[in-house]
Structure formats: C-alpha cells, structure tokens
Swiss-Prot record:
It comes from Rhodococcus erythropolis (strain PR4 / NBRC 100887). One of its GO terms (molecular function) is kinase activity. It is an enzyme of class 2 (transferase). Its EC number is 2.7.1.170. This is Anhydro-N-acetylmuramic acid kinase. Pathway: Amino-sugar metabolism; 1,6-anhydro-N-acetylmuramate degradation; Cell wall biogenesis; peptidoglycan recycling. Keywords: ATP-binding, Carbohydrate metabolism, Kinase, Nucleotide-binding, Transferase. Pfam families: AnmK (PF03702). It catalyses: 1,6-anhydro-N-acetyl-beta-muramate + ATP + H2O = N-acetyl-D-muramate 6-phosphate + ADP + H(+). Belongs to the anhydro-N-acetylmuramic acid kinase family. GO terms for biological process: 1,6-anhydro-N-acetyl-beta-muramic acid catabolic process; amino sugar metabolic process; peptidoglycan turnover.
Length: 397
C-alpha cells in the first residue's frame, strides 16, 4: 500500500509529508521510503497557532478557523507529496494534525486535541484519510503518547537489547523496546515516555528575547556562545515532571513561554546566550538521565534537535559510554522519521491492526487508532493480514 504520513510537531514550524510503500511479509512490516516534502507554515498561520496554545486564551470561533486553515495547509502538502513522491498513486493518507492541547491532570491524560480538519485533505487528494490518532489511546486510559513507540519497537526489534530510540522535537521522547532490561519472569515489555523539553524551552527563549525575530537557536550558535548557569540549571531540574514514573507524557501545556519566564525570575542578569546554553544543558541532562535509567547501551536519535550541534555535543558528554547513533545510519532519515511513523500507523489502522502498545502509553489494552474520512476514490483495497507484524525491515527503492 502506498501511504503518505503528515506531521507537524510541537514546534509548529512546518508540515512534513513522507511517502512510503508498506506491506507485510510474514511477521515483518516492510517499509520502502519514497521521500519527503516539507512546507513551512505561513507566518500568519504560525502566529495564529502560537496565539491559541496554552496558556493563552482563545475562542470557539478561533479554534474553528484554525481547524479549517490547518486542514487546508495539510491538504496542500498532501497533494504536493502525492504528485511529487507518488506520481498521484497514493492510496491512503495518515494525518497527525497539529497538537493544540494535551489535557493532563496529575499523571492522567484526560483528553488531547489535534487540529487540521481531515475533510479538506480527502477533498483535495481524493484519498481516504486516517486522523485523530491519539484519542482512542486516551479513551483506553493511555497517555496518547508517544505514539511513535509502535514504529520504534518494530524498527529496533532484533538489535541489541539496550537499543533506545530518541526523538528530539519540541518535546523529547524515548522508546525502549527491551523495556530497560529483563525481569525475573523473562524479557521486560517495551516502555516509552516523554522525557521533557527538547527544543520547546530553547525556542521559547530565543523567540521571547529576540522579540520574535528568531524562532530557534540556528546551528546551536547561541548555546555554543554561552555558559550554562549551574544555579538556574538546578532550579530547572527541580521540576516534578522529571521524577514522575513512566509512562508519562507532556507538552507545551507545561513547558511554555510563561513557564520559562517564571523560571527565569532572579536570573535577569543572564545573557540570552547563557540562558540558551542552560536550557540546552537541561535537555541533554534530562534525556541522558532517562536513557541511563533504561540501562541503554545505544541511543538511536532523530528529530529537529539533531541539527543543533551544541545540543548533540552536550548530549554525548552526558551519555558517556552510551553510543549515540543517528537514525540515518539505520536507513531512516532523521527529518522523515515522525512522518514515516504516522504513515505506518495509518497503514495499521487501515488493516484493522493495533497502532498503540499498552505498556508504552499506559493504556488498558492496545487499540486500532484513529478515524477514517473516505476520499472520492473510495476506501483503499486491503489485503488480509493474519496477525500483527513483530519487526520492521527498511528497504531502499
């Protein structure tokens, strides 16, 4: 099946579309990436999203407008991907949408909201669309995240038991297919969770203190020019989220601009470079602490944070003897991974197969994820699959 996965992360800077041919061979999911296209949000739409996410207030009218405009933007990127990557032959589109809010009370996720009305995608492309992929997991008591864990477990099964997948987006998340070791009863079940901010607080600081002229630390230049402040870092590390047990999830409903400004009270004399260096060190430390707790021997990293050499250098230092490997070395380009993961989730849904792993999200059971919006071409043709795949093989074109 030829599938397009659509993704925009918590940095809400661009929409990524990855296309792939996906099939099942025995107990193996065979994935052949076809490429990726990416389209930045317009300045107006990005500003509108930023103005609506917590802790800002918004209106039902603004949410309706955003749902439509994000859906139209996703539809345009999907149509481009279908034309440029698939020659117009895509059979299914799987859209994550744009996360606006993750409703968490204590350790329990009570709801999640992704905007980007799928009807616009179906109308523009003629393809059936799988969307709203997180809500079913939440309804079964799960965190609704990290959903990429299903991809990671399939992908890394068969490597060393200490392999851990790490994604550095706005939020950092890890997946340990081996569950961090073995138990007295045998192999441990997979686990996954959000470790905390990756780029979220760095981006917030850069945007705030450059009056919006910059959105992120380009090339890690600010972080490299500064020195982490030991006292501020200790203060940031006192955040209770970091000591919560897994599975757990978080987002910009916690790690946002106002959170950052409150944390910086008493540190007004610090330069922007020192602030960014400290926030970069925070990401490296919290990720490394989480990885070490999983008894990892290898970290396979992907996501936008890999483009920040300062962050990557700090992370290497924090990891010590634990190997840090780019996902590119395993056949999955870092930029494409999340969109590919959602293509796989859409494929699983279309075949009636679970896309969540209960031990990774904390759900009562695994679930078939998402909702279907049929396209004008009708539902995709489905080949009967006797059982869910256990591993994944990446094949080149």
């Amino acid at each position: 099946m030829r599938v397009i996965g659509l993704m925009s992360g918590t940095s809400y800077d661009a929409i990524d579309a990855a296309a792939a041919d996906i099939r099942i061979d025995g107990d193996t999911l065979v994935l052949t990436p076809l490429g990726m296209v990416s389209e930045p949000y317009s300045g107006e739409l990005r500003a509108a999203v930023a103005a609506a996410v917590p802790p800002a207030s918004t209106t039902v009218g603004q949410i309706c407008q955003l749902d439509t405009e994000i859906g139209q933007a996703f539809a345009a990127v999907a149509a481009r991907a279908n034309a440029e990557l698939c020659g117009g032959s895509a059979e299914l589109i799987s859209s994550h949408g744009q996360t606006m809010f993750h409703w968490v009370e204590g350790a329990q996720v009570k709801g999640t909201l992704q905007l980007g009305q799928p009807a616009w995608i179906a109308e523009k492309t003629g393809c059936t669309v799988v969307s709203d992929l997180r809500s079913r997991d939440v309804a079964t008591g799960g965190q609704g995240a990290p959903l990429v864990s299903a991809f990671d477990v399939l992908w890394l099964n068969g490597r060393t038991s200490g392999s851990v997948a790490l994604n550095l987006g706005g939020i950092a998340n890890v997946t340990a297919p081996g569950g961090g070791g073995t138990t007295a009863d045998g192999p441990a079940v997979p686990i996954a969770f959000d470790t905390g901010p990756a780029n979220a607080l760095i981006d917030a600081a850069v945007s705030e203190f450059t009056a919006g002229e910059q959105w992120f630390d380009l090339g890690g230049a600010l972080g490299a020019a500064g020195t982490p402040n030991v006292d501020l870092l200790a203060h940031l590390l006192s955040e209770p989220y970091y000591t919560q047990p897994a599975p757990k999830s978080t987002g910009k409903e916690l790690f946002h601009r106002d959170y950052l400004l409150a944390a910086l009270r008493g540190y007004e004399s610090l330069s922007l470079a020192d602030i960014v260096a400290t926030l970069t060190a925070l990401t490296a430390r919290t990720v490394a602490d989480s990885v070490k707790a999983l008894a990892a021997t290898e970290v396979v990293v992907s996501g936008g944070g890999t483009k920040n050499p300062t962050l990557m250098a700090m992370l290497r230092d924090e990891l010590g003897d634990i190997a840090l490997v780019s996902s590119d070395e395993l056949g999955v380009t870092s930029d494409i991974k999340e969109a590919l993961a959602f293509a796989v989730l859409g494929f699983l849904t279309a075949h009636g197969l679970p896309g969540s792993i209960a031990s990774c999200t904390g759900a009562r059971h695994a679930s078939v994820l998402g909702s279907l919006t049929p396209g004008s071409r009708g539902l995709p043709r489905i080949t009967s699959v006797p059982s869910a795949p256990k591993t994944m093989r990446i094949e080149a074109l």
